[in-house]
């Protein structure tokens, strides 16, 4: 039976997360963080069965060039010489090199201590699909949902052969300009008056009503900046001052996106699954089911449980549980 699992997280500096390490993990490879000099090793992860980098239209084309000297150096390595399929090994090296370049470029532009570096996804693949179908349907979904909208996608398929094939995906969070330079994540806009539900109040008769002449859909009641006497402040050239806020420049951080992305993936799954085996991205509550959702354990939790059940020596918390 097909299952639906789809999680989205942010890889950011504030939590001490490394986007280089995250990429190395999902690719099961070695990557170097040029900012810190640290190297992340995940070559022991044998479950990586497919990996790919999909660059958006405005991304710098030179980031996909792998210097000949790097290729020659890799071909002299023990890893290359021991590989059974040298052509496949070289191809994976090139892809990993390109991904390493992408995320190191992200680190160069995202310098703030609280900077968001990448958006991380993990979602299940129906085990009813064969490998080629998994690759094709996932590629189409990522291209249409993310890459066509200006994001670069670093992704791979993990499959241990235990009936749980899944995708790890890492997306860039800053757009590119048409000239291939980095764009802005946020722009300043008027802080419009909103109701208790967070919606912009519409009242064209209000004295502070404002509407963009070039974009009529951009409108609202502006909020004045007041001094200690409750009088609206004046700025340069005696212009009235209005409150401004930073807003998402491209809409990628809209909280509603997560539900949209989940529903689009569910649609892809159901288009390629029989009617009796459809998936539903909605929560049990929204489906009207009186059922307690399961909790995603993760690999580490399963390993601990296996040790506990096997009676191996473990930490005190598990020993207490064993004696209850």
Residue ranges and their predicted role:
Residues 1-324:
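N-terminal nicking endonuclease/strand-transfer module with a His-rich metal-binding environment
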């Amino acid at each position: 039976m097909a299952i639906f699992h789809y999680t989205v997280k942010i890889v950011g500096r504030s939590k001490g997360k490394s986007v280089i390490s995250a990429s190395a993990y999902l690719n099961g490879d070695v990557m170097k963080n040029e900012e810190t000099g640290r190297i992340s090793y995940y070559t022991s992860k044998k479950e990586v069965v497919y990996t790919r980098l999909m660059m958006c239209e405005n991304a710098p084309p030179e980031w996909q060039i792998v210097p000949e000297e790097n290729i020659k150096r890799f071909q002299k390595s023990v890893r290359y010489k021991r590989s059974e399929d040298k052509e496949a090994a070289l191809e994976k090296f090139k892809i990993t090199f390109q991904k390493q370049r992408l995320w190191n470029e992200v680190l160069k532009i995202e310098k703030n201590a609280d900077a968001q570096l990448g958006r991380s996804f993990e979602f299940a693949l129906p085990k009813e699909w064969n490998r080629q179908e998994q690759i094709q349907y996932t590629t189409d979904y990522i291209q249409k949902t993310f890459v066509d909208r200006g994001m670069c996608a670093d992704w791979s398929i993990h499959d241990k052969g235990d009936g749980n094939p899944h995708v790890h995906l890492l997306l860039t969070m800053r757009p590119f300009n048409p000239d291939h330079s980095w764009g802005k994540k946020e722009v300043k806009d008027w802080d419009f008056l909103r109701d208790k539900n967070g919606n912009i109040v519409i009242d064209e008769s209000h004295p502070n009503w404002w509407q963009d002449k070039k974009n009529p859909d951009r409108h609202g009641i502006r909020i004045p900046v007041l001094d200690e006497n409750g009088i609206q402040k004046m700025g340069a050239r005696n212009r009235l001052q209005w409150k401004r806020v930073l807003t998402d420049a491209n809409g990628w951080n809209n909280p509603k996106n997560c539900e949209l992305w989940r529903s689009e993936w569910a649609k892809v799954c159901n288009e390629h699954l029989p009617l009796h085996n459809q998936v539903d991205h909605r929560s049990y509550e929204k489906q009207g089911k009186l059922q307690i959702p399961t909790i995603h354990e993760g690999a580490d939790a399963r390993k601990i449980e296996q040790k506990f059940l096997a009676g191996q020596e473990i930490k005190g918390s598990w020993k207490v549980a064993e004696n209850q």
